[in-house]
Amino acid sequence: MNFSLSKQSSEKQSSYTDKSRSPNIGMCTVNYKSNLPLQVSAVDQLSTGKGTQFYGHNSYKNERECYNSTKINLPPISSLLPNFENNTPPNVDSRVQFPPQQVYQSMNVVPIVNEIYTPISMNATSDQYPIYYTESQQPIPHSQSPHLTSSAPLMMPVMVPTVYKPLTPYDKEPITIASEPNFTAISMASHPNAALELCHDRPKSVPPGYGVLPTMQEASNGRTKSEPGAVLNGSATFSDWKTDTRISSTKLRKQCPVCGKICSRPSTLKTHYLIHTGDTPFKCTWEGCTKSFNVKSNMLRHLKSHERKRNKVLNTT
């Protein structure tokens, strides 16, 4: 059962707990000027045998019992150490966890060889470890990294990572242009004018012995006819040459390789080219006429002239 003491008894008890008057330092103390009644269990009162007076010996005994009840039971140290007589490893989990593949990708490294498991001693030399390569550091041997040193030949399975190389971008080489095997390649960044002269070569679709592309000045002005054998202006810049090349590549299919005339469509260029070759594939279908033309429209016009003559003769008769 629980019983409560009055305010006077609690204040009286506080006189016994004053450290300056009582030699017992470890006894329970009660606050001075306490308005709350002091709650004391009957079991503690019977165990002390002295009413409401608690001395330091009993309180120390209670604290020791509480400590013993809450003490954590740890395994013996001998189970954690290896047994050198039987040469057995300690009873611990020897699995080693390494970062996942995402960590290797964030480190900007790529593995070369698969990882292997090999038992090594704790006092191994630096020759048994590979060299690590990182993107921002120089090659660092494993011996410079902090590691444990032990004189005992402790053998444990340890994963030895393999060599990694950094992912560096490809080196950009200067752009070079070569026209023919007899000429040497010239860097366009250092000699833009010389590169223009080499690039201005006869196109493959043009038969040999004919003219070349029109000049850049004429192409920019939009002229439909240029002089044969024209050469690009040496003082032109690379941007102008690049723009003119883009324009000329579209007009190359419509340009006559003989006179340099630019036609409106490829079919017109084919008809125009027959003038230079002298071919007349379109022959007159009128009976007794041996004329032929290089353009079909001219042949049809000539055929209508035969029909008009015939109609005129029929009308007169």
Swiss-Prot record:
One of its GO terms (molecular function) is zinc ion binding. It holds the Pfam family zf-C2H2. Residues 1-22 are annotated as: Disordered. One of its GO terms (cellular component) is nucleus. Keywords: Metal-binding, Nucleus, Repeat, Transcription, Transcription regulation, Zinc, Zinc-finger. InterPro entries: Znf_C2H2_sf, Znf_C2H2_type. Its main location: nucleus. The keyword Nucleotidyltransferase does not apply. Disruption phenotype: Leads to altered expression of 79 genes, including genes related to transcription, genes involving cell rescue and defense, and genes involved in cell cycle and DNA processing. It is found in: Nucleus. Transmembrane segments: none annotated. Residues 1-15 have a biased composition (Low complexity). Gene3D superfamilies: Classic Zinc Finger. It comes from the Eukaryota. A zinc finger (C2H2-type) spans 254-276, 282-306. PROSITE patterns: ZINC_FINGER_C2H2_1 (PS00028), ZINC_FINGER_C2H2_2 (PS50157). Probable transcription factor involved in the regulation of the transcription of genes involved in cell rescue and defense, as well as cell cycle and DNA processing. PANTHER family: KRUEPPEL-LIKE TRANSCRIPTION FACTOR, KRUPPEL-LIKE FACTOR 15. This is Zinc finger protein CRM3. It comes from Saccharomyces cerevisiae (strain ATCC 204508 / S288c).
